[in-house]
Curated annotation (Swiss-Prot):
ATP binds at G30, E31, N32, A33, Q34, G35, K36, T37. The RecF protein is involved in DNA metabolism; it is required for DNA replication and normal SOS inducibility. RecF binds preferentially to single-stranded, linear DNA. It also seems to bind ATP. One of its GO terms (cellular component) is cytoplasm. The gene is recF. GO terms for biological process: DNA replication; DNA synthesis involved in DNA repair; double-strand break repair; SOS response. This is DNA replication and repair protein RecF. PANTHER family: DNA REPLICATION AND REPAIR PROTEIN RECF (PTHR32182:SF0). The keyword DNA-binding applies. Belongs to the RecF family. One of its GO terms (molecular function) is single-stranded DNA binding. It comes from the Bacteria. It is found in: Cytoplasm. The keyword Isomerase does not apply. Keywords: ATP-binding, Cytoplasm, DNA damage, DNA repair, DNA replication, DNA-binding, Nucleotide-binding, SOS response.
Amino acid sequence: MILQELQLSHYRNYEELAVTFAPGINVLIGENAQGKTNLLEAIYLLAFTKSHRTAKDRELIGWHQKLARVSGVVERASGRLPLEVQISTSGKRVKVNHLFQKRLSTYVGNLNVVLFAPEDLALVKGAPVNRRQFMDMEFGQMSSKYLYNVSRFNQQLAQRNAYLRQFKYGQQSDRILLGVITDQLASVGGEVVVARQQLVKRLGKWAAELHHHISKQKEELSLQYVSQVEVDDQTTEEEAVAQLRRLYSENEEREIEHGTSLIGPQRDDIHFIVNGQNVQRFGSQGQQRTTALAVKLAEIDLMKEQTGEYPLLLLDDVLSELDDDRQTHLLTAIQDKVQTFITTTSLSGVARQLIHHPTIFTIQSGTLTKEEN
């Protein structure tokens, strides 16, 4: 898929912007604090309806304004598709093909993107919550069912946790109602667990091939999905649900004592294993970066496999974090295949040599200027 056009209105430091992008590699050059990352963030928001940098939507609205608008036209295999996200002080609204959508979950998946930024190294060396967020954001683009189930699970988890807190402090004592809430949570949780197992395995297949190539055949990478539910390729949703129900039953008293759910997909993780060792704990910084790069490139191939179309790739000041060798592997892998947006203070070295016919924009104080070839 291709993002052909992007329009911004009162978004961060952009008062008004209308730009047409090239289908290949688009390079956004500018000094810090000029708006490069804001532009990539707007593309990300057009895909996910939210920022990857802040949970406070008010920060996205321009100074002294009440409404920010991000809209664009996506060229998909099925044709042109207009998308729009409106952010106001009172909430958020989205449009697909000029029609408002009742639920945000029906919007995600119309524009697929893979973001690679310096902070994405936390995917490998950070806390498990980073990897759960990664699964939900990336797998949610590929499967509307997965996104819907994760949304349902989080809502029901919050409800159960609130009820467990009331139990802890003696404000509730209805075990039958707790059982009903728990049964509902287990039903959707089992579906989430099985979907994650299947998708992590497929992602791992692509990541292993890429990592083997990037490491020059010196290292072997595997991804292990870690869950309290014992799942493998043959586990059905019904079996996972039954396991969760049993685990909740066995741990009910302990959960009441803690006032929160101790069992479920909200405790899941992914382990990255390089040559038999957990790279999160024992890997060098170079191994962690190679792993992060392999996983990000694997996302692209998995999305193509799942949806039939390549996603957009957003590279936010990430080239400066990679050595020449890793830059070469990254740029070679995406060349002439994926519409890419690169932010940088300058295009030099390996990147300038490897990028074929880039479309270059300079950004200064929220103003975008296309360089003539």
